Amino acid sequence: MIMNIEKFEEKHLDGVEKIEKTCFAHPWSREDLQNQIGLDTSHFLVATVDGNVAGYMGLQIFGGEGYVTNVAVLPEYRKQGIAESLIREQMKNKMSFITLEVRESNLPAISLYTKCGFKNVGIRPNFYSVPTENAIIMTINNEDI
């Protein structure tokens, strides 16, 4: 397996759109994804395995603060360190902190974020729909990155 992490570009759009539709109840539209390309605040990375888009991570940086929008890996590529590699690569950006929301029931993701140093800092009640579920807010500060 040869994995590469690359900046999200037009050539990755089909693969990232497939990941969105496979992994999320409310996937971002192709247009929403395409709009991220070239934005100064948008830092999207794509992981390819043997040339195929296997996962991606979206991060918005505003005023030195990072907000994770999406982390997803196709089921057939999970448990191979792809999501962790994407997160650790994003941590190289200069930010005072990075924060994200994750479904309470998404124990594999919570475990991954904890492994990467994120801490549970709160709950957003009924943040998700389909199904309705609370979000756990997780954050990592610059000194912990």
Regions inferred by a protein language model and the residue ranges of each:
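Conserved GNAT acetyl-CoA-binding A-motif
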Residues: 93-104
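Conserved glycine-rich acetyl-CoA-binding loop
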Residues: 70, 74-88, 103-111, 115-116, ...
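Extreme N-terminal starter segment of soluble prokaryotic enzymes
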Residues: 2-5
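Short aromatic/hydrophobic contact patches that present stacked aromatics
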Residues: 70-72, 99-101, 137-139
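Acetyl-CoA-dependent GNAT
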Residues: 7-76, 84-93, 141-145
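Short, P/G- and charge-enriched loop/turn segments at secondary-structure junctions
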Residues: 32, 124-125
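C-terminal "cap" of GNAT-fold acetyltransferases
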Residues: 103-107, 116, 126-145
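Residue-level detector of high-confidence beta-strand sites
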Residues: 56, 121-123
